Amino acid sequence: GYASDIIARLLEREGIENYMVEIGGEVTMKGVNQNGKCWRIGINKPEDDSTGIKNDIEEVVQLCKKGGVATSGNYRNYYIKDGKKYAHTIDPRTGYPSEQSILSATIVAEDCITADAYATAFMAMGLEKAREAAKNIPGIEYYVIYSDENGKHQIEYSTGMLQYLPNRPIEAMLNE
């Protein structure tokens, strides 16, 4: 996230008003794309894939203002030992790989370093604590994909995230 923000600052210093900087899935953007439309990026479906080849889209995030978007997940960087999957996200409380139900956490924030930090933190803290933290952190919105008690993928997002989800019609928003 930090590197994306630094490059964005360099572009702005050169007078560039419309850009999208993506480094390793961390994105800083401002203005519009070459077609005059708001920038759109995809959130991948959390499918186990250590190769990074699978790129099926779960959701689209659209940003029409300056900001950062980052997604952290446990479905690409992991290892399996004795039949158990270990994610690359380390829980700072234990020093061991995080064992939470969150598969993917996407954050929209004013800058990418903030989005990146909270996306990783949400992965480590788990759904309940992430939900509570988001209520107390001004300027961030979240979209989380998690595994429920039956192993089925579910989504949850903050109310403010709806403004960045162009594929969700108003009627669907009111019913969720």
Please tell me what each predicted stretch does.
Residues 1-176:
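Mature catalytic core of soluble alpha/beta enzymes
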